[in-house]
Amino acid sequence: MSSLLNSLLPEYFKPKTNLNINSSRVQYGFNARIDMQYEDDSGTRKGSRPNAFMSNTVAFIGNYEGIIVDDIPILDGLRADIFDTHGDLDMGLVEDALSKSTMIRRNVPTYTAYASELLYKRNLTSLFYNMLRLYYIKKWGSIKYEKDAIFYDNGHACLLNRQLFPKSRDASLESSLSLPEAEIAMLDPGLEFPEEDVPAILWHGRVSSRATCILGQACSEFAPLAPFSIAHYSPQLTRKLFVNAPAGIEPSSGRYTHEDVKDAITILVSANQAYTDFEAAYLMLAQTLVSPVPRTAEASAWFINAGMVNMPTLSCANGYYPALTNVNPYHRLDTWKDTLNHWVAYPDMLFYHSVAMIESCYVELGNVARVSDSDAINKYTFTELSVQGRPVMNRGIIVDLTLVAMRTGREISLPYPVSCGLTRTDALLQGTEIHVPVVVKDIDMPQYYNAIDKDVIEGQETVIKVKQLPPAMYPIYTYGINTTEFYSDHFEDQVQVEMAPIDNGKAVFNDARKFSKFMSIMRMMGNDVTATDLVTGRKVSNWADNSSGRFLYTDVKYEGQTAFLVDMDTVKARDHCWVSIVDPNGTMNLSYKMTNFRAAMFSRNKPLYMTGGSVRTIATGNYRDAAERLRAMDETLRLKPFKITEKLDFRVAAYAIPSLSGSNMPSLHHQEQLQISEVDAEPINPIGEDELPPDIE
């Protein structure tokens, strides 16, 4: 799965092995050259933006809550000779294996009955998820949260942290949690039968005092004071954990470092052959490590209510029955160890994987939100139809990976149809009006938003009513993939506009697509435009924040024929204007082309530095071989992508099932290339050395 997540990063982005994060927000994006041209009956004007900047912002705060759920067992890691030819556990073979164990001398049928019950519950995902959380809480523990800080601000209205997280307190990431420790006990070799509801794990060698503390905290309740996304609330996994350790257990030290956590994870995965459990936990943390900072005030509605993180019940009998684990392990994928190996080598890559995953998910959710509920493929059915009727729960990482498949046009496979992880579609499915609390910054704010209060004063708190969820993120890493008019994410585009007689100086748009292109390219050139809706009389401006530099027409409230009037005499050049539009004459043709992409990443308005060796790609043959083996396995779950299609009014969309033979969509990625990473031992090379400053507007 690390190969898939690597492939979501664009080719121009070359991550390093070390990332220094000390702020709760990171702005990521790209600089690119944009060549623009304006032509009318009077002549042609050209302009270039050699260093245009487009970005999204993510934060280490989020509204999540963990809940314990029953999930399917993950059987990878058990000895292969207890499975039948269909990949199912055979209790007769289990009994044979137990009867040969030197640890079990009597009452084998009874042991087999206990083993049968426990093996069909086996799942270590939540334990690894919590251990991964502890790793990054320790590593980036100095990140601070301030409840009175601004979460979102666009000049008309702002949203404060305390409005989104009313029960929060100021804290650093590490100080936001005071974790108790569950009991970590040595498994008594003379124990007659498994203790009810007490998992038992295997361990190599002696459990150090620091590992004892890590395991105890990972099994305990997380009850945070501040809304850091990875420190979200979660219930206790177990009151007690048995460890079958040949050299014993040291008492808890009460302290440890993030490197100690990495060591403990590596030992635990290896001893229990739990590589697939770790992979599921890695995907869960990729879902929750960071959250989007919304692009609009209305998009904050995605995050008003807590997102549920499904955490599978911790169940493991490996410590009770080591004879069922320590021989030639069963596994569904030959690549089952890759995610752990990749994480051990490049733990900071999880940040980039998280950014890439949530961007793909929220960009595609912006498409799903535009689909009619009466369509066959809609917000309720897209996951079920993607897996072609396989029995899965419509929650967790399966939903996110379906969105990733739809965003990239790529088929994705999983070894098990697990339902663990964050379910981020709840806001979309609730189908009711969502109220977003904001602070007024401009008394004209009610003209732009559906606010409860129509007369406001600066500094007043009011509420924006949101019925249609707009996109929370724009395409950045996925810019140019499966492009739509909705997101205006083309590498090049053009529009032709017929002007009324010159003494009139007005343009009328009856086509939403043409209107959006015109407004977007005008904003890209550096011109402010205001249009009038000829039906309702309301105003629409081509406002866009500086980090996107493009107008995104997301208004879906309008029903019926689009009709907008633009008075060209009111067009105003911005402080930074690259193509000035003066006295337009006759037919206008506007076009642009983007080239020369360079990665950019900022924190606190300063470049965010990456150091160390490069994470590089190698030949794709290994992945393709693995993919062919994967397709031949009946047990695996395949998520098939749907193709987004826009209707005449592009604000409304629909999905169609495409050919799965491959995508020829032009993009910044090689669509079939899944990257496998290795360290290139080159000298330290901060990203800032080959980065240009963003446009200032």
Curated annotation (Swiss-Prot):
Region of interest (Disordered), ranges: 666-697
Pfam families in the record: LA-virus_coat
UniProtKB keywords: Capsid protein, RNA-binding, Virion
Primary location class: virion
A single GO BP: viral translational frameshifting
Compartment(s) of residence: Virion
Bias (Acidic residues): 688-697
Record flagged with keyword RNA-binding: yes
RNA-binding is among the record's keywords: yes
GO annotations of cellular component type: viral capsid
UniProt-recorded Gene Ontology molecular function terms: RNA binding
Role this protein plays: Capsid protein self-assembles to form an icosahedral capsid with a T=2 symmetry, about 40 nm in diameter, and consisting of 60 capsid proteins asymmetric dimers. The capsid encapsulates the genomic dsRNA and the polymerase and remains intact following cell entry to protect the dsRNA from degradation and to prevent unfavorable antiviral responses in the host cell during all the replication cycle of the virus. Nascent transcripts are transcribed within the structural confines of the virion and are extruded into the cytoplasm.
Similarity comment text for this entry: Belongs to the totivirus major capsid protein family.
Protein name: Major capsid protein
